[in-house]
């Protein structure tokens, strides 16, 4: 039996009142004692023209690590799920020319002693949505100032690369019902002997 303490940490990067109240209401429904801290991330990235979403994500992660460590935590649990994993695998291949996956846990390189874990790694997105609806919760998406009404927006309308990958997987599933599990397992069955090049510990090994 492992004894541990939980801190339900919420970062407010600059939500409007509507979105912030959604978070507070969810916590009330679940009777969760959240710890909220505020940052100005949305204001910082709103005028960035090149890759604002990437910068925002990096800043959010950094602030979360810093605050968690300040509170004496040694792990951060994020909500990435099974569908996020397979989408990330395909995005890396089709848009990044690389084979890699989202790991279920990893040690921080910038915050000594901190570990990131993903407890929902094997949980399907549809199951999470069903749990949300059963409990009468509302999820916000990014909710930044580019999409300030994201409590009600349809994420399918956001033509991002991830949405494109979601649609591709849906199409492939019509032909092969096992395509999702096959994508997931593909990174479990990498045969180094048949790979032209690979990186290990930052060093590239190339057959050619």
Predicted segments, located by residue:
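Catalytic subdomain that performs nucleotidyl-dependent activation
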Residues: 84-164, 168
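A short glycine-/small-residue-rich loop at the edge of a beta-strand within enzyme catalytic domains
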Residues: 55, 77, 119, 123, ...
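Short, basic, helix/turn surface patches
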Residues: 58-71, 105-111, 165-186
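Short, solvent-exposed coil/turn elements at secondary-structure transition points
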Residues: 12-14, 40-42, 108, 122, ...
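ATP-dependent adenylation/nucleotidyltransferase module used to activate substrates
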Residues: 1-99, 103, 126-134
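The feature marks non-catalytic terminal segments
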Residues: 137-208
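Conserved short-loop catalytic and cofactor-binding motifs
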Residues: 11, 52, 116, 120, ...
